[in-house]
Amino acid sequence: MATISFSHNHQSSDNRRGGSHHHRHGPVVEEIEGLIKVFNDGCVERPPIVPIVSPTIHPSSKATAFDIKLSNDTWTRVYIPDAAAASPSVTLPLLVYFHGGGFCVGSAAWSCYHDFLTSLAVKARCVIVSVNYRLAPEHRLPAAYDDGVNVVSWLVKQQISTGGGYPSWLSKCNLSNVFLAGDSAGANIAYQVAVRIMASGKYANTLHLKGIILIHPFFGGESRTSSEKQQHHTKSSALTLSASDAYWRLALPRGASRDHPWCNPLMSSAGAKLPTTMVFMAEFDILKERNLEMCKVMRSHGKRVEGIVHGGVGHAFHILDNSSVSRDRIHDMMCRLHNFIHPS
C-alpha cells in the first residue's frame, strides 16, 4: 500500500493577495491545498493526487473485483474473495463501504482504497461493495447519504428480483449478515445511512444489518475538543483542524453550523436505534476525543459499542501510511474486523 502525503494548508478567500489566485472562473473562495479548489463561479478543481486504478487484481491477491454503474452519479466496486467464488454453495457477509475525503474528494477507484479493500475482503472473508457517491460542494449533504441508502435499496431489489440482476455475485452475499463501514467522511455516511435504514424499517424482512464499522469517523461541532486544539497532532495526521472546518463549510447545507446533526450527531441521533458498532480511533487524529465522546454517549443510550484506539498513528493511517508502525496497526485492524464480522 503506497504512502500518500497530503498538504492540508487551508486558505480562505480573505487571506489571499495578488493576482496568482485569480482564474478564468474568478477568485478562489475555498481551498484545501493539494486537494480541492473552489472558485467564485462554483467551478471546482480536484488535482489527481491519488492514482485511479481499474478493478483488475493480481491473481496472487486471492480476490476478484469489478465495477457496476448504478446511475450517472453513482457506481460501486465489488470485491469477492476467491474462496467464495470457487464454491457455489458458499455465502459470505456483505460489507458496504464508503470512502473518505471530507465528502469533497476521494473515489472508490483510488489505489489506496482498492488495495485496502482487496486485502480486507480476503482477510475478513466478506464480499465488499465499495460505493462511489456524489461529492460536495457540487452535491452537498444529504446527497451522499441518499446515495448510500439507494445502494442498499438496489442491493435488496437485485436480490429479490425475478430477473436476477447480477446473480453470479449476489448469490455469494448473505443479506441476513450485512455491515455498513467507512473511514473518515465515509464512516459518517455509514452511520447516517444506518440511522435512516433502522428508522425506516423498510428492509427489515429482506436485510439484517448486523453492525456498523466506523474508522476514524468524521464528526464535528462548534466547541473544540482537546485533540482538536493540540496543533502538534497535525504533523502526524492527514487531517488538520482548518481542513476539517473547510470540508464542513463545503459539505453542509449553506448556512448550517458545525452543530448541525449531520456533523454533530450528539445533537440528535446518538440515541437512534443502531446495531452493534465498532469505532476505530487513532492517537494522533484530531478527531480522537470527539470519537471517544461519541462512544461514551452511545453507550449511555444502551448501544453496544466497541472502541479501539491505535497508538502512534494518525487519521486514515490504514490507507495513507506505509510505515512499520502503521502496518502493525493495520494487521490488528484486519484481525479485529474479521472477528467483528465473524463473531465466535
UniProtKB/Swiss-Prot annotation:
Pfam families: Abhydrolase_3
GO molecular function terms attached to this record: carboxylesterase activity
Source organism superkingdom: Eukaryota
EC top class named in words: hydrolase
Signal peptide: none
Region entry Disordered, spans: 1-24
Reaction catalysis annotation: a carboxylic ester + H2O = an alcohol + a carboxylate + H(+)
Keyword terms of this UniProt record: Hydrolase, Serine esterase
Family: Belongs to the 'GDXG' lipolytic enzyme family.
Biological role: Carboxylesterase acting on esters with varying acyl chain length.
Listed name of the protein: Probable carboxylesterase 17
